Protein backbone atom coordinates (compact mmCIF):
# COMPACT_ATOMS: atom_id res chain seq x y z
CA UNK A 1 0.00 0.00 0.00
CA UNK A 2 2.77 2.45 0.90
CA UNK A 3 4.65 1.90 -2.36
CA UNK A 4 1.43 2.21 -4.34
CA UNK A 5 0.58 5.46 -2.51
CA UNK A 6 3.98 6.94 -3.38
CA UNK A 7 3.73 5.98 -7.05
CA UNK A 8 0.21 7.40 -7.27
CA UNK A 9 1.38 10.63 -5.62
CA UNK A 10 4.13 11.01 -8.21
CA UNK A 11 1.64 10.45 -11.01
CA UNK A 12 -0.83 12.95 -9.51
CA UNK A 13 1.93 15.55 -9.36
CA UNK A 14 2.63 14.94 -13.05
CA UNK A 15 -1.01 15.84 -13.74
CA UNK A 16 -0.74 18.96 -11.58
CA UNK A 17 -3.08 17.55 -8.92
CA UNK A 18 -2.13 18.62 -5.40
CA UNK A 19 -1.22 16.02 -2.80
CA UNK A 20 1.15 16.19 0.19
CA UNK A 21 4.72 15.97 -1.12
CA UNK A 22 5.90 12.35 -1.04
CA UNK A 23 9.18 11.69 0.75
CA UNK A 24 9.38 7.91 0.68
CA UNK A 25 8.05 4.68 2.10
CA UNK A 26 9.27 1.99 4.46
CA UNK A 27 8.38 -1.66 4.81
CA UNK A 28 8.61 -4.06 7.74
CA UNK A 29 9.23 -7.66 6.78
CA UNK A 30 9.32 -10.87 8.75
CA UNK A 31 12.40 -13.06 9.09
CA UNK A 32 11.08 -15.04 6.13
CA UNK A 33 10.74 -11.93 4.00
CA UNK A 34 6.96 -11.58 4.18
CA UNK A 35 5.56 -8.05 4.30
CA UNK A 36 4.14 -7.27 7.76
CA UNK A 37 3.57 -3.52 7.60
CA UNK A 38 4.37 -0.49 5.46
CA UNK A 39 4.55 3.26 5.98
CA UNK A 40 4.11 6.08 3.48
CA UNK A 41 5.84 9.33 4.45
CA UNK A 42 4.90 12.80 3.17
CA UNK A 43 5.76 16.36 4.08
CA UNK A 44 3.49 17.71 6.83
CA UNK A 45 0.95 20.34 5.79
CA UNK A 46 -1.45 22.48 7.80
CA UNK A 47 -4.90 22.61 6.22
CA UNK A 48 -6.91 25.75 6.91
CA UNK A 49 -10.12 24.03 5.92
CA UNK A 50 -9.22 20.59 7.27
CA UNK A 51 -11.61 18.44 5.22
CA UNK A 52 -15.18 18.22 3.98
CA UNK A 53 -16.68 16.32 6.92
CA UNK A 54 -18.91 19.19 8.06
CA UNK A 55 -20.18 19.98 4.57
CA UNK A 56 -20.88 16.29 3.95
CA UNK A 57 -23.35 15.89 6.81
CA UNK A 58 -24.80 19.34 7.31
CA UNK A 59 -27.51 20.91 5.22
CA UNK A 60 -25.64 24.21 5.06
CA UNK A 61 -24.42 24.56 1.50
CA UNK A 62 -21.38 26.76 0.89
CA UNK A 63 -21.92 27.62 -2.76
CA UNK A 64 -18.39 28.85 -3.49
CA UNK A 65 -16.83 25.80 -1.84
CA UNK A 66 -19.21 23.44 -3.65
CA UNK A 67 -18.51 25.01 -7.05
CA UNK A 68 -14.75 24.88 -6.47
CA UNK A 69 -14.97 21.26 -5.32
CA UNK A 70 -17.09 20.29 -8.32
CA UNK A 71 -14.56 21.89 -10.66
CA UNK A 72 -11.74 19.97 -8.96
CA UNK A 73 -13.64 16.67 -9.22
CA UNK A 74 -14.46 17.33 -12.87
CA UNK A 75 -10.78 17.99 -13.57
CA UNK A 76 -9.85 14.70 -11.93
CA UNK A 77 -12.32 12.78 -14.03
CA UNK A 78 -11.43 14.58 -17.25
CA UNK A 79 -7.82 13.50 -16.63
CA UNK A 80 -8.95 9.90 -16.10
CA UNK A 81 -8.10 9.98 -12.39
CA UNK A 82 -10.40 7.83 -10.25
CA UNK A 83 -9.83 7.87 -6.48
CA UNK A 84 -11.69 4.80 -5.23
CA UNK A 85 -12.32 6.15 -1.72
CA UNK A 86 -13.50 9.66 -2.51
CA UNK A 87 -14.79 10.35 1.00
CA UNK A 88 -14.86 13.76 2.75
CA UNK A 89 -11.76 13.04 4.84
CA UNK A 90 -9.67 12.26 1.78
CA UNK A 91 -10.07 15.69 0.16
CA UNK A 92 -8.43 18.20 2.52
CA UNK A 93 -8.23 21.76 1.29
CA UNK A 94 -6.49 25.07 1.85
CA UNK A 95 -8.50 28.28 1.60
CA UNK A 96 -6.71 31.49 0.61
CA UNK A 97 -8.84 34.23 2.13
CA UNK A 98 -7.02 37.03 0.31
CA UNK A 99 -7.65 35.46 -3.10
CA UNK A 100 -10.86 33.68 -2.05
CA UNK A 101 -9.52 30.51 -3.65
CA UNK A 102 -9.64 26.87 -2.63
CA UNK A 103 -6.83 24.40 -3.21
CA UNK A 104 -7.99 20.81 -2.90
CA UNK A 105 -5.71 17.86 -2.32
CA UNK A 106 -6.01 14.09 -2.44
CA UNK A 107 -4.77 11.83 0.35
CA UNK A 108 -5.05 8.10 1.12
CA UNK A 109 -3.77 7.27 -2.33
CA UNK A 110 -3.37 3.50 -2.23
CA UNK A 111 -6.82 2.90 -3.76
CA UNK A 112 -6.99 4.76 -7.05
CA UNK A 113 -6.43 4.17 -10.73
CA UNK A 114 -5.81 6.10 -13.92
CA UNK A 115 -7.70 5.60 -17.19
CA UNK A 116 -6.88 6.64 -20.74
CA UNK A 117 -10.26 8.32 -21.18
CA UNK A 118 -12.58 10.15 -18.77
CA UNK A 119 -15.02 7.88 -16.91
CA UNK A 120 -18.57 7.71 -18.24
CA UNK A 121 -21.43 9.57 -16.62
CA UNK A 122 -22.47 6.44 -14.74
CA UNK A 123 -18.93 5.70 -13.53
CA UNK A 124 -18.41 9.34 -12.55
CA UNK A 125 -21.61 9.39 -10.51
CA UNK A 126 -20.69 6.16 -8.73
CA UNK A 127 -17.31 7.67 -7.87
CA UNK A 128 -19.08 10.55 -6.08
CA UNK A 129 -21.68 8.52 -4.17
CA UNK A 130 -19.93 8.57 -0.77
CA UNK A 131 -18.83 12.21 -0.79
CA UNK A 132 -21.84 14.10 0.57
CA UNK A 133 -24.54 12.53 2.73
CA UNK A 134 -27.04 15.37 3.19
CA UNK A 135 -29.54 15.65 0.29
CA UNK A 136 -29.14 19.43 0.00
CA UNK A 137 -25.37 19.09 -0.25
CA UNK A 138 -25.77 16.31 -2.82
CA UNK A 139 -28.15 18.41 -4.89
CA UNK A 140 -25.76 21.37 -4.92
CA UNK A 141 -22.79 19.17 -5.80
CA UNK A 142 -24.70 17.41 -8.57
CA UNK A 143 -25.71 20.69 -10.15
CA UNK A 144 -22.20 22.18 -9.96
CA UNK A 145 -20.51 18.98 -11.15
CA UNK A 146 -22.86 18.70 -14.13
CA UNK A 147 -22.05 22.26 -15.15
CA UNK A 148 -18.31 21.62 -14.79
CA UNK A 149 -18.54 18.54 -17.05
CA UNK A 150 -20.90 20.18 -19.53
CA UNK A 151 -23.69 17.74 -18.72
CA UNK A 152 -27.38 18.32 -18.05
CA UNK A 153 -28.06 18.94 -14.33
CA UNK A 154 -31.51 17.40 -14.83
CA UNK A 155 -29.77 14.12 -15.67
CA UNK A 156 -26.87 14.25 -13.22
CA UNK A 157 -28.72 15.38 -10.09
CA UNK A 158 -31.29 12.54 -9.84
CA UNK A 159 -28.62 10.00 -10.80
CA UNK A 160 -26.35 11.24 -8.01
CA UNK A 161 -29.23 11.28 -5.52
CA UNK A 162 -30.05 7.65 -6.36
CA UNK A 163 -26.39 6.61 -6.15
CA UNK A 164 -25.98 8.29 -2.76
CA UNK A 165 -29.18 6.67 -1.45
CA UNK A 166 -27.90 3.27 -2.56
CA UNK A 167 -24.47 3.78 -0.99
CA UNK A 168 -25.79 4.92 2.39
CA UNK A 169 -28.47 2.22 2.49
CA UNK A 170 -25.75 -0.37 1.91
CA UNK A 171 -23.73 1.05 4.82
CA UNK A 172 -26.69 1.44 7.17
CA UNK A 173 -26.52 -1.98 8.93
CA UNK A 174 -22.85 -1.52 9.83
CA UNK A 175 -23.41 2.05 11.02
CA UNK A 176 -26.46 0.99 13.04
CA UNK A 177 -24.46 -1.80 14.70
CA UNK A 178 -21.83 0.71 15.80
CA UNK A 179 -24.56 2.99 17.11
CA UNK A 180 -26.18 0.16 19.11
CA UNK A 181 -22.81 -0.79 20.58
CA UNK A 182 -22.02 2.82 21.44
CA UNK A 183 -25.42 3.94 22.72
CA UNK A 184 -26.67 0.79 24.43
CA UNK A 185 -23.61 -1.38 24.89
CA UNK A 186 -25.24 -4.04 22.73
CA UNK A 187 -23.10 -6.91 21.48
CA UNK A 188 -22.80 -7.58 17.77
CA UNK A 189 -24.57 -10.99 17.93
CA UNK A 190 -27.51 -9.47 19.83
CA UNK A 191 -27.89 -6.62 17.37
CA UNK A 192 -27.67 -8.96 14.39
CA UNK A 193 -30.38 -11.16 15.90
CA UNK A 194 -32.68 -8.13 16.24
CA UNK A 195 -31.76 -6.85 12.79
CA UNK A 196 -32.49 -10.20 11.14
CA UNK A 197 -35.88 -10.24 12.88
CA UNK A 198 -36.52 -6.76 11.47
CA UNK A 199 -35.66 -8.01 7.97
CA UNK A 200 -38.10 -10.93 8.37
CA UNK A 201 -40.88 -8.56 9.42
CA UNK A 202 -40.17 -6.39 6.40
CA UNK A 203 -40.19 -9.29 3.95
CA UNK A 204 -43.44 -10.63 5.42
CA UNK A 205 -45.09 -7.22 5.19
CA UNK A 206 -44.19 -6.94 1.53
CA UNK A 207 -45.89 -10.31 0.97
CA UNK A 208 -48.98 -9.49 3.01
CA UNK A 209 -52.11 -7.98 1.52
CA UNK A 210 -53.30 -4.72 3.01
CA UNK A 211 -54.76 -5.43 6.42
CA UNK A 212 -54.13 -5.74 10.13
CA UNK A 213 -51.10 -8.04 9.70
CA UNK A 214 -49.40 -5.56 7.44
CA UNK A 215 -50.09 -2.69 9.83
CA UNK A 216 -48.79 -4.69 12.80
CA UNK A 217 -45.59 -5.63 10.98
CA UNK A 218 -45.06 -2.07 9.83
CA UNK A 219 -45.45 -0.87 13.42
CA UNK A 220 -42.77 -3.34 14.57
CA UNK A 221 -40.43 -2.24 11.81
CA UNK A 222 -41.01 1.42 12.60
CA UNK A 223 -40.19 0.90 16.27
CA UNK A 224 -36.93 -0.86 15.38
CA UNK A 225 -36.12 1.83 12.83
CA UNK A 226 -36.66 4.64 15.33
CA UNK A 227 -34.56 2.96 18.00
CA UNK A 228 -31.59 1.73 15.99
CA UNK A 229 -31.61 2.88 12.36
CA UNK A 230 -32.92 6.42 12.14
CA UNK A 231 -29.87 8.14 13.61
CA UNK A 232 -27.65 6.56 10.93
CA UNK A 233 -30.17 6.79 8.08
CA UNK A 234 -28.41 10.01 7.16
CA UNK A 235 -30.45 10.66 4.02
CA UNK A 236 -33.68 9.21 5.42
CA UNK A 237 -33.62 6.98 2.35
CA UNK A 238 -34.87 3.90 4.20
CA UNK A 239 -37.59 5.85 5.99
CA UNK A 240 -38.91 7.25 2.72
CA UNK A 241 -38.71 3.92 0.91
CA UNK A 242 -40.53 1.99 3.65
CA UNK A 243 -42.78 4.86 4.77
CA UNK A 244 -41.53 4.90 8.37
CA UNK A 245 -42.33 7.83 10.66
CA UNK A 246 -39.12 9.86 11.00
CA UNK A 247 -37.65 13.15 12.04
CA UNK A 248 -37.07 15.32 8.95
CA UNK A 249 -33.50 16.36 8.24
CA UNK A 250 -32.68 19.88 9.32
Regions from the language model: what does each represent?
Residues 158-233:
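Non-catalytic N-terminal targeting/anchoring module and adjacent flexible stem/linker
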Residues 45-46, 96-98, 136:
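Short loop segments at secondary-structure junctions
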Residues 62-66:
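Short alpha-helical scaffold element within the canonical Hanks-type protein kinase domain
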Residues 46, 88, 111:
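Short, glycine/acidic-enriched loop or turn micro-motifs at the edges of active sites
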Residues 86-96:
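Hydrophobic residue at the +6 position relative to the catalytic HRD Asp in the kinase catalytic loop
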Residues 101-175:
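C-lobe/activation-segment region of protein kinase-like
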Amino acid sequence: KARRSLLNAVQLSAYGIATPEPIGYAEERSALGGLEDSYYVTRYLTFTGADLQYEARSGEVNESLTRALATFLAELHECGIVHEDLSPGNIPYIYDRAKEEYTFMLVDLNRMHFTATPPSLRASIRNLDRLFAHPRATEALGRAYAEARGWEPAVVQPALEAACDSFWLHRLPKLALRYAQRAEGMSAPTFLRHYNAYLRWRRLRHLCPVGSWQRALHARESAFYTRYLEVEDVRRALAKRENYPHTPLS
